[in-house]
Amino acid sequence: MNTQFFEEYQTQLLDWQKKFFSTWMESLPKGTAEIKLTDTFETSLKLQEEMVKSYLEAQEKSATMMIDAQKQFWDNYFQALRQEPVSAN
């Protein structure tokens, strides 16, 4: 069987990882470095809530991308097997 599909899967996995981290970093609230210890409890709580929400959104997107990549991989795998000639003994 051709290793092209496995190489394609590895490429898709790498792309998925890049998209996951870029999505997560983009969704983090801006200006987190400006938060001081003297901020109120409510401000800290809101920041934590935003971070959890953004992390969960990134997880959801990454799970969807990973499932799509796995579907594509297995579709390609079975398609390649169907194209291989069957040897008759």
From Swiss-Prot:
Keywords: Cytoplasm, Membrane, PHB biosynthesis, Thylakoid. It comes from the Bacteria. Disruption phenotype: During N(2) starvation fewer PHB granules accumulate per cell, while their diameter is increased by about 25% after 6 days of nitrogen starvation. Decreased rate of PHB synthesis, however overall accumulation of PHB is not significantly different. Poly(3-hydroxyalkanoic acids) (PHA), of which PHB is among the most common compounds, are prokaryotic intracellular storage compounds with potential uses as a renewable, biodegradable thermoplastic. Cyanobacterial PHB synthesis is particularly attractive as cyanobacteria use CO(2) as the carbon source. Signal peptide: none annotated. Residues 39-83 are annotated as: Helix 2. Pathway: Biopolymer metabolism; poly-(R)-3-hydroxybutanoate biosynthesis. Residues 3-26 are annotated as: Helix 1. GO terms for cellular component: plasma membrane-derived thylakoid membrane; polyhydroxyalkanoate granule. GO terms for biological process: poly-hydroxybutyrate biosynthetic process. It is a peripheral membrane protein. Induction: Constitutively expressed, increasing levels as growth progresses (at protein level). Disulfide bonds: none annotated. It is found in: Cellular thylakoid membrane; Cytoplasm. Homotetramer. Probably has 2 alpha-helices (resides 3-26 and 39-83); both helices alone target to PHB granules, although helix 2 may be the main anchor. Both helices are required for oligomerization. Nitrogen-free medium induces chlorosis in Synechocystis, leading to the degradation of the photosynthetic apparatus and concomitant accumulation of cytoplasmic polyhydroxyalkanoic acid (PHA) granules which in this cyanobacterium are composed of PHB. A phasin, it attaches to the polyhydroxybutyrate (PHB) granule surface regulating the number and size of PHB granules within a cell. It probably also acts as a regulator affecting the biosynthetic activity of PHB synthase in vivo. This is Phasin PhaP.
